[in-house]
Amino acid sequence: MNQLRILVADDNQFMRTAYKRILETQDDFEVVCMAEDGAEAVEMALELVPDVAILDVMMPKMDGIEAARQITDRYPQTGIVLISAFDDLAFVSAIMKDGATRRAYILKNSLDDIGELIRVVEAVVDGRAVLDPRIVQKLMALYKGNSRPELASLTESEENVLKLMLEGYDEPAIARSLGLPREPVEALASSACEKLGLTEQNGTDRTPWAVQTLLNLCVA
């Protein structure tokens, strides 16, 4: 079994240690380095090339968003998990650009469930884009409040599927969560994406582009 090599960066030593302990409950996860600021995180990432970098947004010397940019500019295959206390959509937009995959933006409060960090890392490694549920709720509320007439309204079923897509769940997991067969979930996901103006030209996994579209609509 190949080890998943992870970098953890947070200026709070307690949080660094806590994340490491949670991650290493998984036999195939290995925290290969821990950094206490953004600049050190970039230096370590460029040397060790981790599979995933978990970065606090607010760090001294360099914030997590800039650290993520520098890491992925050099090694785009490295997955990024940004952890933040802020649900500011401008922060989210800064990391979720141009249909970016293998990226997550998660709020610290969500990590009270220790399994959530593991789920998010696994989703990022699988190539998905992941947003915190609170961010998803905020985006969907803004989307529904958008009065532009060309925007088709989502049905309740489409919205339920889209929310879980944006949270980084794949279609089999969405089907299990909603208690539906996979085929109706696939149809609902497709129709929701079409209402956002996404087509097959955006790829088989349109979730990253759905994230980008909603951010474009909701972030001034």
Segment roles from a protein language model:
Residues 51, 57-61:
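The short loop immediately C-terminal to the conserved phospho-acceptor aspartate in CheY-like receiver
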Residues 37-40, 62-66:
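Acidic catalytic/metal-coordinating carboxylates
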Residues 93-103, 109-151:
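Short, flexible helix-to-coil linker/hinge segments that flank and couple to helix-turn-helix
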Residues 10, 56, 84:
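Active-site residues of response regulator receiver
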Residues 15, 60, 88, 199:
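The feature encodes the CheY-like receiver
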Residues 189-220:
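Basic, Lys/Arg-enriched C-terminal extension of HTH/homeodomain DNA-binding domains
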Residues 137-190:
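Helix-turn-helix DNA-binding segment
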Residues 34-52:
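Acidic, metal-coordinating helix/loop segments flanking the phosphotransfer/catalytic sites
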